[in-house]
């Protein structure tokens, strides 16, 4: 008799995705972040659901309802802080996951990669709208500044912004629709993640060497399930350290001041995970140019497969490309730092140089290093 997990229609899908899935025998801890992102998404949906039970999406009561959750709801404070810091963990895992894809050449699975880019945009949109919901000073002004960027679109810009706002400024209509979108988007992300996995399982996973590993596969369970559980424990440890010891470490103190349209905060800045893109936006004096650079800072990932010139898939045996990759990481950290600084000398110049370097690495230096390494192989 066939095992039920191999015969039952539903169990069969789970079996082929998480149990009997043939996986390369040499994938490292960098391959853990996919499952960790799944865990983060589940944590965010569950904590978000409980927060939504007590939250009110009205400009008069939104701030008070968040305070009420923290003070009066049983364990409301921990649910709120798991949700807020869970978003930070989500982005840490996301950046590691994308970085792994760039380093080891996983982008050659173009369908999986493009769905991943779409997922990244959706997650960023969700996080942005979630940041608006507590209706603090940074929520209000962040929403005003970022939505206002759309007015840079020629001809339809102003109408588009007012359509998104639901009026002539960020107000009750904006908050209500942002709450509605923030609630529905995680479920869309779940569906996209399933499609992401579907495309991945068509080709099988990549591995650190970048070489086809069909001759040496092992079952996902128990080898990688146990490895994923270790990753999960470490994620939980870091998240709970954040939540229980310094829950506001990654937040902005201005968001504890209720939103006031008549008083602008001294430094308007988004959450830390958007600072690199915000720095690129600010480094271009022209509004439309800045918006284009902001979108391209993520969209540039879509042309990485087209600019892959090396004969080797992975960077494992390509020292020149490795140097460029770590230069890119350092550049992103620099941009993140600049995004949190005021717009004054020398930060403006550093931001502009870091932005130029960011695009140069992807568009010029990486393809050139691939060609040079191909030549070196012939020596």
UniProtKB/Swiss-Prot annotation:
It comes from Genetta maculata. PANTHER family: CYTOCHROME B. Heme 1 (or BL or b562) is low-potential and absorbs at about 562 nm, and heme 2 (or BH or b566) is high-potential and absorbs at about 566 nm. Gene3D superfamilies: Cytochrome Bc1 Complex, Chain C (1.20.810.10). Component of the ubiquinol-cytochrome c reductase complex (complex III or cytochrome b-c1 complex) that is part of the mitochondrial respiratory chain. The b-c1 complex mediates electron transfer from ubiquinol to cytochrome c. Contributes to the generation of a proton gradient across the mitochondrial membrane that is then used for ATP synthesis. This is Cytochrome b. It holds the Pfam family Cytochrome_B. Heme b b566 binds at residues 97, 196. A ubiquinone binds at residue 201. It is a multi-pass membrane protein. Heme b b562 binds at residues 83, 182. InterPro entries: Cyt_b/b6_C, Cyt_b/b6_C_sf, Cyt_b/b6_N, Cytb/b6-like_sf, Cytochrome_b, Cytochrome_b_C_euk/bac, Cytochrome_b_N_euk/bac, Di-haem_cyt_TM. Keywords: Electron transport, Heme, Iron, Membrane, Metal-binding, Mitochondrion, Mitochondrion inner membrane, Respiratory chain, Transmembrane, Transmembrane helix, Transport, Ubiquinone. GO terms for molecular function: metal ion binding; ubiquinol-cytochrome-c reductase activity. Its main location: mitochondrion. Binds 2 heme b groups non-covalently. SUPFAM superfamilies: a domain/subunit of cytochrome bc1 complex (Ubiquinol-cytochrome c reductase) (SSF81648), Transmembrane di-heme cytochromes (SSF81342). GO terms for cellular component: mitochondrial inner membrane; respiratory chain complex III. The lineage of its organism: Eukaryota, Metazoa, Chordata, Craniata, Vertebrata. Its cofactor is heme b. Belongs to the cytochrome b family. One of its GO terms (biological process) is mitochondrial electron transport, ubiquinol to cytochrome c. The keyword Transcription regulation does not apply. It is found in: Mitochondrion inner membrane. The cytochrome bc1 complex contains 11 subunits: 3 respiratory subunits (MT-CYB, CYC1 and UQCRFS1), 2 core proteins (UQCRC1 and UQCRC2) and 6 low-molecular weight proteins (UQCRH/QCR6, UQCRB/QCR7, UQCRQ/QCR8, UQCR10/QCR9, UQCR11/QCR10 and a cleavage product of UQCRFS1). This cytochrome bc1 complex then forms a dimer.
